[in-house]
Amino acid sequence: MSTPGDFSLSPFILGGAVDPRSMSQLGNICHADYMSTSTESQERSLNNPNDTHPEIVNVVSTFQLGVKLELRKIVQKARNAEYNPKRFAGAIMRISSPKSTALIFQTGKIVCTGTRSIEESKIASKKYAKIIKKIGYPIHYSNFNVQNIVGSCDVKFQIALRTLVDSYLAFCQYEPEVFPGLVYRMASPKVTLLVFSTGKVVLTGAKDEESLNLAYKNIYPILLANRKEDISNQ
């Protein structure tokens, strides 16, 4: 259902089960981002989590229109919309401001993904509703809910993933032959983190910014204790 390089439609981004086999592209991006980080910024943030924080890279929300939809009619009359039922059960629509993608289902349920804040997601959802209303549907916009907030950050030091998984086995999944990142499932807040040896961290599953930031605050000392240089000197 997703296109190459489009993580916004993957089960990971939508808040589903994390499958490392589907995340190899994300691992490559994380590695490239880390290599572009300067040594000066790495030293500045070390030992001080306040210098770094998760940046929201995607908000996934859902809402209802309260009416059955004819998806072929919608894609015929709307711009930037497509529908291929052999590939995916819903129609896909995109708008540029705020930049986002909507997955539109016959039931009237819509998934909005790709925005960088909850407020942007609300604005985008109402724009999609307005587009469908103009096509001729007597919509009733309701039940806007944030399903998943995805954040990304860089702790600016390398991490010994094997040591980390040995210390926190109950929370970790690590299959380096399949995927270079470690999957850490935090119990409270209920957030899943992808941790890379480069220091890149992706957080998913949060329903609000407070949970996203708290998850990072909780994981930072664990990552610092498993800093690769510190482990090698013991």
Swiss-Prot record:
PROSITE patterns, alphabetized: TFIID
Arranged from A to Z, the UniProt key words for this protein are: DNA-binding, Nucleus, Repeat, Transcription, Transcription regulation
| sequence repeats, residue ranges | 52-136, 142-223
Q: Has UniProt tagged this entry with the keyword Transcription?
A: yes
Q: Name one GO molecular function term.
A: RNA polymerase II general transcription initiation factor activity
What GO terms in the biological process aspect are recorded for it? DNA-templated transcription initiation; positive regulation of transcription initiation by RNA polymerase II; transcription by RNA polymerase II
Q: Which organism is it from?
A: Entamoeba histolytica (strain ATCC 30459 / HM-1:IMSS / ABRM)
What subunit structure does UniProt give?
Answer: Belongs to the TFIID complex together with the TBP-associated factors (TAFs). Binds DNA as monomer.
Keyword Glycosyltransferase tagged: no
CC terms in the record's Gene Ontology section: transcription factor TFIID complex
Function according to Swiss-Prot or TrEMBL: General transcription factor that functions at the core of the DNA-binding multiprotein factor TFIID. Binding of TFIID to the TATA box is the initial transcriptional step of the pre-initiation complex (PIC), playing a role in the activation of eukaryotic genes transcribed by RNA polymerase II.
**Where does the record say this protein resides?**
Nucleus
Its taxonomic path starts at:
Eukaryota, Amoebozoa, Evosea, Archamoebae, Mastigamoebida
The name this protein carries in UniProt is TATA-box-binding protein 1
- What InterPro entries does the record tag this protein with? TBP, TBP_CS, TBP_dom_sf, TBP_eukaryotic
Family from the record: Belongs to the TBP family.
The UniProt entry, under Pfam families, shows: TBP
- The primary gene name is TBP
Superkingdom classification of source: Eukaryota
